[in-house]
Amino acid sequence: MMSSDQQGKCPVDEETKKLWLREHGNEAHPGATAPGNQLECSANPQDNDKTPEYHTTVDLSQSREVSTIPRTNSDRNWIYPSEKQFYEAMMKKNWDPNSDDMKVVVPLHNSINERVWNYIKSWEDKQGGEACGGIKLTNFKGDSKKLTPRAWFRSRILHLAKPFDRHDWQIDRCGKTVDYVIDFYSTDLNDANSQQQPLIYLDVRPKLNSFEGFRLRFWKSLGF
């Protein structure tokens, strides 16, 4: 089960949810090695100062939003792609995107990333990152086809819904690498109140691939 401090929920209308599922639900997305014109945030420190190269004439915003997420080995934050970059990255992957969808998908993508970061900061509170100015994000990737052990247990043993997406984020805590995993769930429309908007739930927790991951989860389970 997801504890209250592990899950974030974000109400979205059904059309927005469908767009998110279509654009995020079936492919792994590039991580920190992706160039600045790929789907996720810019990974190249120089990309903040460069004018992106565009290859289509589609009329979409070229404005980019600077995130609140600090970047490892940089004094700057990660920067989100513009609507046009997002669209062209999908075109490059042969996803046949609808340009009108970008005005919905891009803000949702950015907002959910910010929520993920806030939950990671909650896990990292008083863990030593304050000594060097705070934790930073090193890299990230998405793979909706790969179930986490918790998601597998929930779906196969408890017969609950599978997450529609999964992300893996790696953060730097004053030189120590800590891995986090995020499962994305949504309410079943058949169960949801017809008067309410569907919800996207974020199950954010440290990965159990290191002693630090086990330690963080153990102390959190004790209420620390």
Swiss-Prot record:
Disulfides per UniProt: none
Subcellular location, record wording: Mitochondrion inner membrane
GO cellular component: mitochondrial inner membrane; mitochondrial intermembrane space; mitochondrion
GO molecular function annotation: holocytochrome-c synthase activity; metal ion binding
Catalytic function, reaction form: holo-[cytochrome c] = apo-[cytochrome c] + heme b
Pfam families recorded: Cyto_heme_lyase
Biased composition range(s): Basic and acidic residues: 11-27
EC code: 4.4.1.17
Keyword annotations: Heme, Iron, Lyase, Membrane, Metal-binding, Mitochondrion, Mitochondrion inner membrane
Region (Disordered): 1-64
Role played: Lyase that catalyzes the covalent linking of the heme group to the cytochrome C1 apoprotein to produce the mature functional cytochrome.
Similarity field: Belongs to the cytochrome c-type heme lyase family.
Listed name of the protein: Holocytochrome-c1 synthase
Organism: Saccharomyces cerevisiae (strain ATCC 204508 / S288c) (Baker's yeast)
